[in-house]
């Protein structure tokens, strides 16, 4: 799990624009993974970032890089809470919800549809995805949009611009610690 991979997949979260990102990386050695995650958390926690292996498979791991404070705020939205309760979550507490999400990923192997709430997607789009079985959307970008298409398109453009700038800055020698914004 290289810093370059994290920057490519998680720039909007590092910049404070997004609640969280998910990315897959190869994992042949679990001990090495644990050391890498600990090191990354030590480096990024002072900026408000947490990194966890949310799903571990035989030769790969799904990493969740997120901002716990932003997640708490996102999950406190009434519509988000309704979606979580309907999916069997008993609380809106961010840490407990992340543990529950990880269990659901391990148990089913599929992505639980509520996962969008953990990535900063608008609850109306997450609900639309669940209720419409991933069809009937208005637009597709980083997620399928069922609500405010104009706002979503602007957000997608911000995420792309952020990723482009961060990748360029990384290529020019800026460290992940310097690129990560304290929020």
Task: Kindly give the residue locations of the regions a language model identified.
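A structured, charge-rich N-terminal accessory region that forms the first stable segment of a protein
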Residues: 1-57
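Long, compositionally biased
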Residues: 142-183
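A glycine-rich, hydrophobic loop/mini-helix early in the fold
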Residues: 37-93
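Short linear loop/turn motifs
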Residues: 58-59, 98-101, 130-133, 140-147
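Short helix/loop capping segments that flank catalytic or ligand/cofactor-binding pockets
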Residues: 33, 73-74, 127
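Short, surface-exposed beta-edge/turn micro-motifs
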Residues: 18-20, 59-61, 112-114
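Internal catalytic-core helix/loop-beta-alpha segment
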Residues: 86-113
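Hydrophobic/aromatic-rich, well-ordered segments within soluble, folded domains that form packed cores
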Residues: 111-138
